[in-house]
């Protein structure tokens, strides 16, 4: 009897552990202000101009034991750009930059994930911005996961990439120090 009980407990523990190692689906927690899509670009080579996008949503699946099976999808409203300066934001929304009247949404959808070290990954995917779709690689880092105080389960990541403005049809010349923009992404997802 004791052997059967121990065997059942061992099998149950193994199945429970296997279930925890399977991929889980998450929705990015934008509503709780636990996710950000920020950017920075050099201003004349003297300082950094920082900004954010306020309106976006997305989801991801993640399996720590098999990260190459992970997937990411994000949709962003380009008109939600905020650089803390109303006139500059109006210019960024214009045809000189994001052309939000013609291209109101930017999207990123992963095509592959590759482990690059302990808790680090390269997420390859297609970024559609300003009417142009190009492959990009986001260098990402797993921050952590666990239960939250409200009965849910969360996982968090940060990442970043550099984009050449001209690659996405942005022809406005900002000078030699401002040809690229850094995207800085921080997300916390709630498991579904």
Swiss-Prot record:
Residues making up the signal peptide according to the UniProt record: 1-23
Cellular-component GO terms for this entry: periplasmic space
Flavoprotein is among the record's keywords: no
Pfam annotation, one family: YceI
Keywords annotated in UniProt: Periplasm, Signal
Subcellular localization: Periplasm
InterPro entries found in the cross-reference section: Lipid/polyisoprenoid-bd_YceI (IPR007372), TTHA0802/YceI-like_sf (IPR036761), UPF0312/YceI (IPR023480)
SMART domains according to UniProt: YceI
Annotated family: Belongs to the UPF0312 family. Type 1 subfamily.
HAMAP family linked: UPF0312 (MF_00780)
Protein name: UPF0312 protein Avin_03250
């Amino acid at each position: 009897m004791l052997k059967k009980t121990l065997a059942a407990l061992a099998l149950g523990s193994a199945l429970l552990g296997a279930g925890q190692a399977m991929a889980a689906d998450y929705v990015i927690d934008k509503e709780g202000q636990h996710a950000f899509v920020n950017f920075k670009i050099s201003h004349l080579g003297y300082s950094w101009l920082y900004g954010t996008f306020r309106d976006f949503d997305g989801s991801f699946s993640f399996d720590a034991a098999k990260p190459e099976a992970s997937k990411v999808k994000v949709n962003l409203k380009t008109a939600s750009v905020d650089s803390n300066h109303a006139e500059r934001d109006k210019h960024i929304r214009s045809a000189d930059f994001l052309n939000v009247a013609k291209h109101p949404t930017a999207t990123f959808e992963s095509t592959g994930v590759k482990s690059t070290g302990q808790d680090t990954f390269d997420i390859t995917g297609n970024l559609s911005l300003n009417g142009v779709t190009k492959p990009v690689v986001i260098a990402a880092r797993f921050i952590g996961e666990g239960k939250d105080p409200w009965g849910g389960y969360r996982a968090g990541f940060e990442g970043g990439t550099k984009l050449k403005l001209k690659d996405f049809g942005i022809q406005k010349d900002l000078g030699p120090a401002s040809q690229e923009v850094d995207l800085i992404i921080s997300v916390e997802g709630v498991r579904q």
